[in-house]
Amino acid sequence: MYAIIKASGQQFKVQEGDIICFDNMGLEPKSAVEFKEVLAVDNGELTVGTPFVEGAVVKGEVINEGRDKKVIIYKKRRRKDSKLKRGFRRDFTRVRITKIA
């Protein structure tokens, strides 16, 4: 059984027990979270929503929040003595899927 959910502007294919990582939602660790924007559910037969499946809910538990490793962005324009170096660290929330209903 799997479901396709929309969380933080992204779509994820999840099963019970999966761990997903997405943009920070500002939730407390060990708290419960419900994803009501379920795009599709497959439990033997595929049910696709228009745009969401009515009555379908995916429940999860927040594991932790944190920051990813730094990504270095470097741009250089040749022969112009022009270069730009920036770093970026994404804040994330990690959630374990507990139930698909």
Swiss-Prot record:
GO terms for molecular function: rRNA binding; structural constituent of ribosome. Keywords: Ribonucleoprotein, Ribosomal protein, RNA-binding, rRNA-binding. GO terms for biological process: translation. InterPro entries: bL21-like, bL21-like_sf, Ribosomal_bL21, Ribosomal_bL21_CS. GO terms for cellular component: cytoplasm; ribonucleoprotein complex; ribosome. This protein binds to 23S rRNA in the presence of protein L20. Belongs to the bacterial ribosomal protein bL21 family. Part of the 50S ribosomal subunit. Contacts protein L20. PANTHER family: 50S RIBOSOMAL PROTEIN L21 (PTHR21349), LARGE RIBOSOMAL SUBUNIT PROTEIN BL21M (PTHR21349:SF0). This is Large ribosomal subunit protein bL21.
